[in-house]
């Protein structure tokens, strides 16, 4: 009886804490307020009204968070240049906060930190690889030759772009296998009613 009671209490507490998040990625919650702030920022301050659009944006946001998680696991957040860049940005943000009283300070700083990490890890895993591995690039062209109507050297730019998309898709699929992602549809639906 005691175990059942403890299990009930644990389940209740978990459901309450989960309800304040739109998702959980590898045990780390994606806070509803942070997600809504990011959504509004990228949608000219508009509040979400369409569930499908909100769900599509959440999927993009989760992909972003997965890349950031991978960057942290690789130790990119420990890089001296990264830390110096963040300190410089934070100093500038503090100066603006004192001047203008920015209420979104924490969100802006976190967005910048994560954005730089996402850029750095994408550069390593996608962009540099597509630019420097000529054999892999040509192999990709050969396997998808029916898509291109011209010789490799004439469509190299298109091949690089397509190869980068392919690398990103494979990378995201591997991240989704590696890290557990749980979406809270009930919380997401509530956001369309705000």
Residue locations for each model-derived region?
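Sec-dependent N-terminal signal peptides
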Residues: 4-13
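Sec/Tat signal peptide C-region and signal peptidase I cleavage site
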Residues: 15-19
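Peptidyl-prolyl cis-trans isomerase
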Residues: 20-25, 29-30, 36, 40, ...
